[in-house]
Amino acid sequence: MIKRLLKKRRILEDQSGATLMEFGLVAAPFFLMLLGIMDLGYRGYVDTVSKSVLHKVARDASTGEMTVAEIEQAVTDGLDTLILKNASIDVTTQSYFDFTNIGKPEKLTTDVNGNGTVDPGDCFIDNNGNDIFDTDYGIAGTGGPDDIVSYKIDVNSPRLFPLASMIGLSDTMTVSNSTAVRNQPFGAQVDLVETCVSTLD
């Protein structure tokens, strides 16, 4: 009986293996946090590099010697070694007459009833030459001499580690960047045309 009690006491006081058990308790949250930091760092890296690539391509394209397809290819080549498999890169280019008009509607020059919207009898500056009043008159493409070109890039990529769903996040990430550059004066900038509305379709 005494031997049995002593043996039981020795087992209860035995500390060997305690460190391993403690490590097992903290290992999962520690490695989850470590992977999260690495994933966040990768996202920041993609953001920084994609911004740098976009700025370089935009400067190169300002000479008017690059097509939209060549711009898209240059961006893809610049990010090819960086992004993961199954990632997609979307590049959007729109040209404007000047910086102040980026993303804005065409300017009304005559507002008959003063309501701030285009109505029959009103006139506006038809920046993109399509005879329609646009709330964002940007023209798809690389624009002409002295035009302002807005470049936007969207990188949709799988995360570095497929663990985001464990904490309710998406398994993919989206990184977006944009910049605007004035084209070089490689010719004469096209003048703006005033258009008057007779009827609304």
Positions of PLM-derived features:
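Alpha-helical assembly-interface signal, strongest on the long, hydrophobic N-terminal helix that forms
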Residues: M1-L79
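Short, conserved structural patches
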Residues: I2-K3, H55-D201
